[in-house]
C-alpha cells in the first residue's frame, strides 16, 4: 500500500478513534484540524477536543480556525503541506471549495449512514428513531453540497433492537477505519459512484424532542428512547416535572383499551405505562436533580402509588 500524506479534520470522540487507528497505519498524518478549544463546566475550564488530545499525544501540528473566513491563513498553511488527501469525520466547521481542492485526491468524508439516506447532522439518531434495521459507513468524495458527494466505499451495519445511539456510535467508531483504509489503498484506481435513491435528511437533534408520545406504538416508543440515549434523553412529564427514562421493556400483552399514557401499575418490577398497543415497563427513572435509579431504589424513598391510573399528557 502506498504511503499517503494526510490532513485529518474532526472533533468529537468518534473522530478521535478513527485518528488513533489511522496513526497505526503506514500513512503520514501531516496535520490535524479540529474545532477551537471550549470553556466547559462550572469552572469554565478550557478543554481540548478529543481529536486535539490524540494529535498532541502523537506530536502532530494542530490547526483550530474559528472559520476559514475568519482564519484564511490556515488554508495557506495547509496548501504548503501539499497533502495527498484530506480525511474528514464530524469536523463541525463548514469548509469552502478552496479547501476541497487542496489535496491531490481531494477530501474524503466518513459519513455514518447509507447515503443518500440520512444526510446531515444526526444520522445515527434518526436511523434508530425511524426503526431502520440497517445502516452503514460511507466513504464519500466531498463536494459543495450537504453529504451529496460520490461514494467510494461502503460498509453495511445491522441495527440491533437493543442498539442505542451510544452503542451504534461506538460501533461506527470501531469500524470506520476498515472502509477508510480500503479506500486509501485503492485511491488511485477507485471509481466514484453517484449516490442512488431518494435522499432523506437527519436534522439536528433538539432537547425538546426527547418527550415521549405514548399515543404511538410500543415499538415506536422503543425506537424513540434508544435514539435519544444518551442525549438528550427520553422523558415524560409528571406533575410538571421531566422524568427521564432508562432501562425498559415492552410487555407483550393487550392494554385492555386503557388509554395511551395511562400509568397502569407501579411496583418493584417497574413503572408500567400504556401505549397505543402494549404496555411499556420502565425499570429505571431519573427525577430532576437526581441520578438515574432502579425503580426498586426509587420506591424505597418515594411513594408513587398515587399515580396509578393517572394519565400522562
Curated annotation (Swiss-Prot):
Q: Where is the signal peptide?
A: none
* Pfam family, any one: Formyl_trans_C
E.C. number: 2.1.2.9
Could you say which enzyme class this protein belongs to? transferase
Reaction equation(s) it catalyzes: L-methionyl-tRNA(fMet) + (6R)-10-formyltetrahydrofolate = N-formyl-L-methionyl-tRNA(fMet) + (6S)-5,6,7,8-tetrahydrofolate + H(+)
**Domain of life of the organism in this record?**
Bacteria
What InterPro entries does its record include?
Fmt (IPR005794), Formyl_trans_C (IPR005793), Formyl_trans_C_sf (IPR037022), Formyl_transf_N (IPR002376), Formyl_transf_N_sf (IPR036477), Formyl_transferase-like_C_sf (IPR011034), GART_AS (IPR001555), Met-tRNA-FMT_C (IPR044135)
Query: GO cellular component annotations, sorted alphabetically?
Result: cytosol
Q: Which residues bind (6S)-5,6,7,8-tetrahydrofolate?
A: 113-116
Q: List the disulfide bonds.
A: none
Report a single Gene Ontology molecular function. Answer: methionyl-tRNA formyltransferase activity
Keywords associated with the record? Protein biosynthesis, Transferase
Under the heading PROSITE patterns, the entry gives: GART (PS00373)
Q: Does the keyword Transferase apply?
A: yes
**Family per similarity comment:** Belongs to the Fmt family.
Name the job this protein performs. Answer: Attaches a formyl group to the free amino group of methionyl-tRNA(fMet). The formyl group appears to play a dual role in the initiator identity of N-formylmethionyl-tRNA by promoting its recognition by IF2 and preventing the misappropriation of this tRNA by the elongation apparatus.
Which HAMAP family would you find in this protein's record?
Formyl_trans (MF_00182)
NCBIfam families according to UniProt: fmt
Q: This chain belongs to which protein, by name?
A: Methionyl-tRNA formyltransferase
- Which species does the entry assign this protein to? Francisella tularensis subsp. novicida (strain U112)
Gene of origin? Answer: fmt
Amino acid at each position: 500500500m502506498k504511503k499517503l500524506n494526510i490532513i485529518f479534520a474532526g472533533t468529537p470522540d468518534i473522530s478521535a478513534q478513527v485518528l488513533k487507528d489511522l496513526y497505526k497505519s503506514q500513512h503520514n498524518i501531516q496535520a490535524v484540524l479540529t474545532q477551537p478549544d471550549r470553556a466547559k463546566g462550572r469552572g469554565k475550564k478550557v478543554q481540548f477536543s478529543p481529536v486535539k488530545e490524540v494529535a498532541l499525544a502523537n506530536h502532530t501540528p494542530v490547526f483550530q480556525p474559528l472559520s476559514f473566513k475568519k482564519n484564511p491563513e490556515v488554508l495557506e498553511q495547509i496548501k504548503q503541506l501539499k497533502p495527498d488527501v484530506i480525511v474528514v469525520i464530524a469536523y463541525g466547521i463548514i469548509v469552502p471549495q478552496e479547501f476541497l481542492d487542496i489535496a491531490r485526491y481531494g477530501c474524503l468524508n466518513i459519513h455514518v449512514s447509507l447515503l443518500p439516506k440520512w444526510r446531515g447532522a444526526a444520522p445515527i439518531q434518526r436511523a434508530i428513531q425511524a426503526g431502520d434495521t440497517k445502516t452503514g459507513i460511507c466513504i464519500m468524495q466531498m463536494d459543495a453540497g450537504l453529504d451529496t458527494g460520490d461514494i467510494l466505499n461502503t460498509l453495511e451495519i445491522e441495527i440491533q433492537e437493543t442498539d442505542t445511539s451510544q452503542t451504534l456510535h461506538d460501533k461506527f467508531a470501531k469500524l470506520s477505519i476498515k472502509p477508510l483504509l480500503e479506500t486509501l489503498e485503492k485511491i488511485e484506481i477507485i471509481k466514484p459512484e453517484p449516490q442512488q435513491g431518494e435522499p432523506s435528511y437527519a436534522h439536528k437533534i433538539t432537547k425538546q424532542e426527547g418527550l415521549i408520545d405514548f399515543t404511538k406504538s410500543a415499538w415506536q416508543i422503543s425506537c424513540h428512547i434508544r435514539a435519544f440515549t444518551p442525549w438528550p434523553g427520553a422523558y415524560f412529564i409528571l406533575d410538571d416535572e421531566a422524568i427521564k427514562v432508562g432501562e425498559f421493556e415492552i410487555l407483550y400483552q393487550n392494554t385492555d383499551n386503557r388509554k395511551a399514557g395511562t400509568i397502569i401499575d407501579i411496583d418493584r418490577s417497574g413503572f408500567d405505562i400504556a401505549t397505543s398497543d402494549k404496555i411499556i415497563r420502565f425499570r429505571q427513572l431519573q427525577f430532576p436533580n437526581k441520578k438515574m435509579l432502579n425503580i426498586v431504589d426509587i420506591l424505597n424513598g418515594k411513594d408513587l402509588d398515587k399515580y396509578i391510573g393517572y394519565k400522562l399528557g
